[in-house]
A protein has these predicted regions:
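Ubiquitin-like/PB1-type beta-grasp interaction modules and other compact soluble beta-rich domains
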Residues: 1-90
């Protein structure tokens, strides 16, 4: 299966690009993110803490928010788009 990642801020820097296509054998958003981290090892500490997705990582699947507890089980289809970005803050 192949998905496209749109990456923002420090995720973009770690993957050296704003868009990355990843081919992987899994079927969930979590599997896709794991494949991304395997392809770009610099991303792993930005995404995971103690083997779990960091709380602050925002995940969108085809423009829809995927909550942290749904990432591991949310199905993904060939050609889907996953966006990863850190929280936005301002003042």
């Amino acid at each position: 299966m192949k998905v496209k990642f749109k990456l923002f801020a420090n995720f973009r820097e770690a993957a050296k690009g704003k868009e990355v296509e990843i081919t992987f054998a899994g079927s969930t958003v979590g599997d896709a993110i794991g494949a991304l981290a395997a392809a770009f090892p610099a991303m792993k500490p930005l995404i995971y803490q103690d083997g779990r997705l960091k709380q602050y990582v925002n995940v969108l699947l085809n423009g829809q928010t995927v909550k942290g507890d749904q990432v591991a089980s949310m199905p993904v289809n060939d050609g889907d788009e996953i966006a990863l970005f850190p929280p936005v803050s301002g003042g």
